[in-house]
Amino acid sequence: MAALPVHAQTGSIQDVLVVGEALSGMGNVRSDEVDGPFGLGQTIADIGRSITPVTEDLLNEAAIDNLQELQRVAPNTFQAKGFGAPSLPTLRGQLGEVFSAGMRRQVGNNGLGIPLSFNSVGQIDIVRGTPSVILGTTQRTGGFVNITPKRPDLNEPEGRVSLTGGEWDQYGAQLDYSWVIDPERQGVRLSLEHKDEGSFYDYAGLDSTNLFAAYRLLPAEHMEWNVSLEYYDVEWTDNAGINRPTQNLIDHGLYVQGQGVQPNGSTVPGAFAVVSPTGEVKIPRSRVHTHPDDINGAETLLLHSVFNVELADSIRLVNRSYYEHLEREEIAQNSFVEIVDGADTLENRTELHIHNTTLGANLRYNDVLGYSQFTTEADLPTDLTGPLSNREIPLTDAQKARLVELRPGLFVSPGAQYDIDGDGVGDFNLSDTTDSSSVQGGLFVQHKQPLTERLQLTLGARGDWYDVTARDPIAPEGVEAARDNHSDFLKAGEATLHYRPNESVTLYATSSYSESTSNSMAGGNVLGANNQIDPLNFATENTLHEIGLKYAPAGSPWYADAALFDQTRSLRNRDGSNSGVATRGLETQLFYRGEAAWVSVGANWLDAEFDNSAAFQAAEQVADAFDDSRPDIIQGTGVGAPNFAAFPASSQRLHGLPDWSLSAAGGYVFAEGWSVGGSAVLTSDYPLDYLQTVTIPEQFTLNANLAYEFNQGASRIRLDVFNLTDEENWTPVFEGGYFGSSLVFPELPRHVQLQFTQRF
């Protein structure tokens, strides 16, 4: 079956999911063999999913340095701001997962994790839709990105140093060098990156160091071992954007002034506070909800090992191992606390690839000790135009009594509920505090069956057994700490039909069913108000039906594809519950790479609705925060906010997502040593809040760059201008819509960046 390969090819060992053929290294999607979460010997045309591979060079050419910027080169990746530092991708309107070398990372709790450094990235492959049976159950099923770590070159040493400077005192440096220890047998690669960045936004910035080291060994023919270590130390700002997102703020930059007053008369931000508007002013877009005394930092250590050996003709064994340790501490002046006092994840997956069949076993262990407190936050009552004290929420004695003191003066929620006074009602505020451990064991099988010369059926099945224990790590004095154990079995199955009418075109239809988990910070599990692990957290059903077409002519600089999909999945709410979401849509992409030019174009249409499920928001609408004393400014309802609105089950449109978006990126070499490039993203209008009282209009962002290479191509200077037309764009602060009525994020104004790169 030359037209439809089904055998794992073993002459080349690659630890990647999808490879963009290196016409210039920038990624015209081609038909190279691949290994990864969908099996060995695959090409992008062989995989029945919508996929965008992004090579390291393409990341550099499109100036992509965080997950949100992936939308410049990939359709259906529109993303909320993730409080200024998204730690998870968004695919098809839902948070996705981050995999590295085919193994799922801890990352964040609903996106509020730690920034993702691109220092270790050799390639990022963007896969839309549920994970394969090889990958197994995950919390987030809109899709995933798989990072292929950098690897040493075994033929010749090479290195690169880059220095970057931009507006607002943003500086960065990276040293990347690959040594050949034994030609064509073993090598080492080291990449060190440091960032010291100020910010356009008030009281914001980032200071990080990332060290990545990789070792590659080919001890014998048809045998390879890749191991890598990454250490990341980062301090950054939890940036909540601007509160009180009225339509006047979005359209004209006008902000309603006045500090909220609680029912007890306090002007400290709190539940059901009401603002009597005192004026409406043009607010600087840099005036965001931050505080100079906030503390926010993290350290993480990752270890990856991939061993790949050919046992016999068309029989290959692959063993992947992964370990991650995370520590994190955020203490904010608005009373928010999240401390990960140690999270450890260890996973091993063994795959046996026999002709057209893949068999495997997976074992994953996760242990998390963490403390949190988010029950007293209140964004809408705060007047950002007033003194910093407006933003501070010192806890009252009554509030402290419903929490537990972790350190002198620092209060967090206990990890369970207790009735101290015996009145039959719990006496504490619960967040995500937990001391939990979990063991996950999985078995999977995937088989490819040729039906005719041009028709192939791929079937896969998987089962995962979970055993989870959650304990209260900081129970109040005088009570026995609560704990619970839960075991469950999760199932997954998928089927893909491929039809290849000729060498250039592939048609596919995929159907998938999977059950996934719902976790708290760092992948932990919490006790509910009844001091038990909620079994519904292990019963989240996800379905995917997708049909697509891929055009990949051999020897051509062109690649194009299109996909139609219908997908159901869940949305984890702030209180730990889950809401169903149904999505359907269309996405298409086109790539071209010629001798002097490259182009990437993407488009998507998305219809996302609640799947007869409840929804939650900080307030029913922004007007709830105001009284009606100044109808000339805003017609307030006087309800007070936050009021923790709960909306009944419905099929309401999922807010915070555009119906459609378009993206384009490209570059052109117009003279010897000189090149220009740019990118553009256009999004439709969309409602910011559940009741659709505030609308983000159609927006576009245009970026441009000019580069000059000299010294026989070894030296390069590049100037980037971002937001070239200086648009005043807005983005949701967080995924899922909870903050839709209370916060919105102002995107950066026009700014420039200069980069010098020296290769040696």
Where are these regions (language model features)?
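C-terminal beta-signal and adjacent terminal beta-strands/loops
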Residues: A608, L682-P687, Y708-F760
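Face-selective signature of the C-terminal outer-membrane beta-barrel domain
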Residues: T300-L326, I339-P473, R500
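Acidic/polar loop-and-plug regions of large Gram-negative outer-membrane beta-barrel proteins
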Residues: R216, H222-E310, R320, E329-A332, ...
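Acidic, small-polar-rich N-terminal luminal/periplasmic segments of exported/outer-membrane proteins
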Residues: I13-E156, I547
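Structural signature of Gram-negative outer-membrane beta-barrels, strongest in the C-terminal barrel
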Residues: L218, T358, N362-N366, Y371, ...
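Outer-membrane beta-barrel proteins
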Residues: T164-Y171, H194-A220, E224, W236-N239, ...
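Gram-negative outer-membrane beta-barrel transporters
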Residues: E453, G555-L571, S577-L691, Q755-R759
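Outer-membrane beta-barrel translocator/receptor signature
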Residues: N119-G122, I134-L211, P219-W225, L301, ...
